[in-house]
Structures are given as structure tokens and as C-alpha cells.
Amino acid sequence: FAPVNVDCSDHPKPACLQEQKPICGSDNKTYDNKCSFCNAVVDSNGTLTLSHFGKC
């Protein structure tokens, strides 16, 4: 059973689509989608991780 991961290698992006596929981060914040989550991961210098898919 591998830990759940999100590939953020193609981020950050200047703009994210308004796609609703919520992701819960380790900061207990719900991100709208992978793009906004990955941008936050980059901003956090990699300290932010995925808690689970779906709202927190």
C-alpha cells in the first residue's frame, strides 16, 4: 500500500482552471484541484503534502 501522491513536476502554473476536483492538503485546507494544490506545494517549498483526495 503506497502513500497517495500527486505529480507536481509540471507546476507551478500561472493560472489554474476552475476544475472542481478537491484535494485536502496536510495544512487541513481544501484545494479546488491538483493545479491549485501543486502551486501551493511549490510555494511551501515542498513542506505541504497530500492528506487525501476530496474535501478536508
Swiss-Prot record:
It is found in: Secreted. Disulfide bonds join C8-C38, C16-C35, C24-C56. Keywords: Disulfide bond, Glycoprotein, Protease inhibitor, Repeat, Secreted, Serine protease inhibitor. The record marks Q18, E19 as: Reactive bond 3. It comes from the Eukaryota. GO terms for cellular component: extracellular region. SUPFAM superfamilies: Kazal-type serine protease inhibitors (SSF100895). GO terms for molecular function: serine-type endopeptidase inhibitor activity. Glycans are attached at N45. Residues 6-56 form the Kazal-like domain. CDD domains: KAZAL_FS (cd00104). PANTHER family: OVOMUCOID-LIKE-RELATED (PTHR47729:SF1), SERINE PEPTIDASE INHIBITOR, KAZAL TYPE 2, TANDEM DUPLICATE 1-RELATED (PTHR47729). Avian ovomucoid consists of three homologous, tandem Kazal family inhibitory domains. This is Ovomucoid. The lineage of its organism: Eukaryota, Metazoa, Chordata, Craniata, Vertebrata.
